[in-house]
């Protein structure tokens, strides 16, 4: 249950609920399985801390199972996306203290990507997405795991909170 900060395109995002491992992860073997001694695959090796030797992180296998299933059944995986940067209650403590929000559940929309699925909807920066298709969201992994079961073009319903107002927004997922 580790969280790490990732710098991408002049933005910071966070990977949460990762498995910390001492397995060596290098550019050629990231994406490979993290295997338990009994032979079970428990994660996908993803990232290492470049300033520390022998510390790597893996995405838990349950999050990537929909991707694996799609690859096995269809030979490919098309990643769907809403097109947002968002934080959850697991990440907010890692952000500087000027980010003043008390988030008990849901995910906080920090930014909407231009020309994304969310861009021309009623979703706004500062909204809190509490559920997708009636499935409660508490972490970005909850959202990611659900989106991985969808295809670009699929329609989803987001329940959001904006201040004291609750509303439902329907959007068609984009392709990442």
PLM regions with names:
Residues 105-113, 130-133:
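Acidic- and glycine-rich mobile interface elements
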Residues 150-152:
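Surface-exposed, short loops/turns at beta-strand junctions within beta-sandwich domains
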Residues 40, 126-128, 154:
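Structural motif
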Residues 118-140:
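Conserved PDZ fold ligand-binding element
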Residues 155, 166-168:
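A structural signal for beta-strand boundary/capping segments at domain termini and interdomain linkers
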Residues 1-96, 102-105, 113-114, 121, ...:
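Serine-dependent protease modules
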